Amino acid sequence: MTLERTFVAIKPDGVQRGLIAEILGRFETKGFKLVGLKQLTPSKELAEKHYGVHKDRPFFSGLVDFITSGPVVAMVWEGEGVIASARKLIGATKPLEAEPGTIRGDLAVNIGRNVIHGSDGSDTAVFEINLWFQENELVDWNPSDQAWRVE
């Protein structure tokens, strides 16, 4: 496996419910490296670009309204297989279909308030990281326990 990066965002419901530390902890415990982190209330323009693939869907305006309704914690995580692994940690989009032990399975109830977003593939990850972060906001660093994480 090769090192890759993925974009993850704690949505306004997760921030308002005080779930930031728990969600960060799940990714750190898994062994991934946090290379980008910021809290912001997304602009309508940013939200429309982020959800652009859904622009013709009936729920598009609701997605934009929700993601711009309050602060979001935007993150970039790095690690071997981090994109697929993050998707497994996050769980199914519909919380009622998410397995127990996943973030959505444990912390979310409704699809409209499903706590977290994660990139669904490598192309999406690159697009979302570049949309939400400037290159100088991402930090390359070597954790002191790196030798204990990977071979």
UniProtKB/Swiss-Prot annotation:
The active site is at H117 (pros-phosphohistidine intermediate). It is found in: Cytoplasm. Its main location: cytoplasm. One of its GO terms (molecular function) is metal ion binding. NCBIfam families: PRK00668.1. Belongs to the NDK family. Homotetramer. This is Nucleoside diphosphate kinase. It comes from Prochlorococcus marinus (strain NATL1A).
